[in-house]
Amino acid sequence: MEVNTLAFIAVLLFLAVPTAFLLIPYVKTASASSGSN
């Protein structure tokens, strides 16, 4: 199966960008709550 590099990068960005937007606030709140705990 031939994988188009450009398509692979596009899918990777398409998945990574929303994931980062969700993970960054979660990690901040998680580290803040664990730090105060």
From Swiss-Prot:
**Ranges that cross the membrane:** 7-27
GO cellular component terms attached to this protein's record: chloroplast thylakoid membrane; photosystem II
Family annotation (InterPro entries): PSII_PsbM (IPR007826), PSII_PsbM_sf (IPR037269)
Where is this gene product found?
A: Plastid, Chloroplast thylakoid membrane
Q: Which SUPFAM superfamilies match?
A: Photosystem II reaction center protein M, PsbM
**Membrane topology classification:** Single-pass membrane protein
Q: What is its main location?
A: plastid
Asked if the record carries the keyword Thylakoid, the reply is: yes
Judging by the UniProt lineage, the source's domain of life is Eukaryota
Keyword field: Chloroplast, Membrane, Photosynthesis, Photosystem II, Plastid, Reaction center, Thylakoid, Transmembrane, Transmembrane helix
Q: One Pfam family from the UniProt entry?
A: PsbM
Return one Gene Ontology term, BP aspect.
photosynthesis, light reaction
Q: Which family does it belong to?
A: Belongs to the PsbM family.
Sum up the protein's function in the record's words: One of the components of the core complex of photosystem II (PSII). PSII is a light-driven water:plastoquinone oxidoreductase that uses light energy to abstract electrons from H(2)O, generating O(2) and a proton gradient subsequently used for ATP formation. It consists of a core antenna complex that captures photons, and an electron transfer chain that converts photonic excitation into a charge separation. This subunit is found at the monomer-monomer interface.
Quaternary structure, from the entry: PSII is composed of 1 copy each of membrane proteins PsbA, PsbB, PsbC, PsbD, PsbE, PsbF, PsbH, PsbI, PsbJ, PsbK, PsbL, PsbM, PsbT, PsbX, PsbY, PsbZ, Psb30/Ycf12, at least 3 peripheral proteins of the oxygen-evolving complex and a large number of cofactors. It forms dimeric complexes.
Q: What is the recorded name of this protein?
A: Photosystem II reaction center protein M
Give the species this sequence originates from.
Pinus thunbergii (Japanese black pine)
